[in-house]
UniProtKB/Swiss-Prot annotation:
InterPro entries: CHCH, NDUFA8. The lineage of its organism: Eukaryota, Metazoa, Chordata, Craniata, Vertebrata. This is NADH dehydrogenase [ubiquinone] 1 alpha subcomplex subunit 8. Belongs to the complex I NDUFA8 subunit family. Complex I is composed of 45 different subunits. Accessory subunit of the mitochondrial membrane respiratory chain NADH dehydrogenase (Complex I), that is believed not to be involved in catalysis. Complex I functions in the transfer of electrons from NADH to the respiratory chain. The immediate electron acceptor for the enzyme is believed to be ubiquinone. A motif (Cx9C motif 3) lies at residues 78-88. Pfam families: CHCH. One of its GO terms (molecular function) is protein-containing complex binding. GO terms for cellular component: mitochondrial inner membrane; mitochondrial intermembrane space; mitochondrion; respiratory chain complex I. Keywords: Disulfide bond, Electron transport, Membrane, Mitochondrion, Mitochondrion inner membrane, Repeat, Respiratory chain, Transport. A motif (Cx9C motif 4) lies at residues 100-110. It comes from Mus musculus. It is found in: Mitochondrion inner membrane; Mitochondrion intermembrane space; Mitochondrion. Its main location: mitochondrion.
Length: 172
């Protein structure tokens, strides 16, 4: 029935949260974006195609798992330079990167040496990319209604309006 809404169970919704502050997210954003790019884009593609977040729970869990794994790797390999970097961002005015370039360089060097991750160039993550996915295409990806029948053809001569146009100020 179209009136019944099926909600996911609590077990389906249960995931371990990524409990970090905005400064930590901002400090890790460039490397996180590079490492979890495919899972994030696949999740956003699912959300755009399905228009229903309940159908994208599996992809959402993969995004969450990627984020948790990313922060665990940072914590185990580069905890000290990362803490200096996000603390600098947290205490700087409006979390601006320009105040913390020295800490950023130390963190980027640590990540490069120990994990082999190169900081992506500016604009690299915002480029348009194609996402290869194993999900089937939705039946109606644009959620559009069926097209209505065209108006019937009017037979006979059409006469001009009796009192002119509706836009009276145009005809004066």
């Amino acid at each position: 029935m179209p009136g019944i809404v099926e909600l996911p169970t609590l077990e389906e919704l249960k995931v371990e949260e990524v409990k970090v502050s905005s400064a930590v997210l901002k400090a890790a954003a460039h490397h996180y974006g590079a490492q979890c790019d495919k899972t994030n884009k696949e999740f956003m593609l699912c959300r755009w195609e399905e228009k229903d977040p309940r159908r994208c729970l599996k992809e959402g869990k993969l995004v969450n798992g990627c984020a948790l794994n990313f922060f665990r790797q940072i914590k185990s390999h580069c905890a000290e330079p990362f803490t200096e970097y996000w603390t600098c961002l947290d205490y700087s005015n409006m979390q601006l990167f320009r105040h913390c370039r020295q800490q950023q360089a130390k963190f980027d060097q640590c990540v490069l040496d120990k994990l082999g991750w190169v900081r992506p160039d500016l604009g690299q993550l915002s480029k348009v990319t194609k996402v290869k996915t194993d999900r089937p295409l939705p039946e109606n990806p644009y959620h559009s209604r069926a097209r209505p029948e065209p108006n019937p053809v009017i037979e006979g001569d059409l006469k001009p309006a009796k009192h002119g146009t509706r836009f009276f100020f145009w005809t004066v």
